[in-house]
Amino acid sequence: MKTQNSWLRSAAVVAAGVVMTVLIISPAAYSKGKKKKAVATPTETMTPTPTPTPEVHMWNFDQDKAGEVPAGWKAIEGDWQVIADPSAPSKPNTFGLPAGRLLKSLTSALEYYPMAIETDPTEYSDFTLEAQFKSAGGRFDCSGGLIFRYVDEKNFYLLAAGCPSDYFALSRMTDGQLINLKQSVVPTDKDTWYRLKVVAQGGHFMCYDDDKMIFDFDDSKIAKGRVGVWARDDSQAEFDDVKVTVIGAGESAPTPAPAASASP
């Protein structure tokens, strides 16, 4: 009997030891199914990338004095000046050539190109250049246009329009020689405002009249330069709201639309 009791006591001690070992090593073994609360992971807030502001340069000449060359511009050839014009798209002033100018000589009548250039030394490569233009008259010609990628007075590109021949042309001045690159017939009346625009990107040019693309053309002779305005012979050309928007500073080049039919 003593031996049996002794054996039972020994068994009880061993069992108690096993229970204590389980409690110490694995508390989960006797837990009543308690679950840990999930900790929420903070959601990362994405900061949107700001859209770059387009780089725009604009001149409306309304703060400049009539009869003088406006601030930021230089007359290369011709009597360019601010003109008070009630018909100006942005009143009261335009920039152009007044009536009553005399040509240097009759022999220079077909090769006289008055022009004015903005004085900022910035040279534009990819950009949109646009302006309001009208021709108020002229005995020999009624033309005007936008100069771009101007290197000097003998090397630049030109988008011009005029009457009475109703021409709309892209040209390049190379070493003083004006070379016609592409031309189309576009009705152009005297004393009527038109919006000329050229989009230049690399060697590709898209040319517009009143927001209608007339044609596009590829030429890569001049990579960059300044901008300006131009006239031919004794044309009384006027310009307003000259604007340059740099492509690549928040401005994308437009998708080319089908061009109007062009004459050879």
Please identify what each model-predicted range represents.
Residues 61, 129-131, 191-207:
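Short tryptophan-centered beta-strand motifs in secreted/extracellular beta-sheet-rich domains
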Residues 65-102, 110-113:
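Extracellular glycan-recognition surfaces and repeat-rich motifs
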Residues 208-228:
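Short, solvent-exposed beta-strand-to-loop segments that form ligand-recognition rims
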